[in-house]
Amino acid sequence: METKNAKAIARKVSIAPRKARLVVDLIRGKNIAQAQAILTFTPKVAAPVILKLLNSAVSNAVNNLKLNREQLYVKEVFVNEGFRLKRMFPRAKGSGDMIKKRTSHITLVITSSTNLQTSKEEEQSGSKN
């Protein structure tokens, strides 16, 4: 049986990937209720963006794939580096330093815990043969 995964991607988010990864690491592997509670009370700039992305992925799972909301958990979540905006910061004697304003691409995949159980059962039955 093929597992059903719901996916949501936020591209060109104006948060540095290093800062976004701190928040993303908190919710990896958690169920949806725990992840939403963690993101609600995390005092980081990336937390509201990732919470919005999580809610979008949950909506995709419930509406498009007809999965049960209570059985969903975060299967994988990762942050890739987006493009960099290069800006000049004026320095002495007419020179300037480069400022790199970094952006992120955040990908979140959720699945149902029943999918996990069935895939484990298939692996066990396949290994016996």
Swiss-Prot record:
One of its GO terms (molecular function) is rRNA binding. Coiled coil: none annotated. Keywords: Ribonucleoprotein, Ribosomal protein, RNA-binding, rRNA-binding. The keyword Isomerase does not apply. It comes from the Bacteria. One of its GO terms (biological process) is translation. GO terms for cellular component: cytosolic large ribosomal subunit. The keyword rRNA-binding applies. This protein binds specifically to 23S rRNA; its binding is stimulated by other ribosomal proteins, e.g. L4, L17, and L20. It is important during the early stages of 50S assembly. It makes multiple contacts with different domains of the 23S rRNA in the assembled 50S subunit and ribosome. The globular domain of the protein is located near the polypeptide exit tunnel on the outside of the subunit, while an extended beta-hairpin is found that lines the wall of the exit tunnel in the center of the 70S ribosome. HAMAP family: Ribosomal_uL22_B. Belongs to the universal ribosomal protein uL22 family. Part of the 50S ribosomal subunit. This is Large ribosomal subunit protein uL22. It comes from Aster yellows witches'-broom phytoplasma (strain AYWB). The gene is rplV.
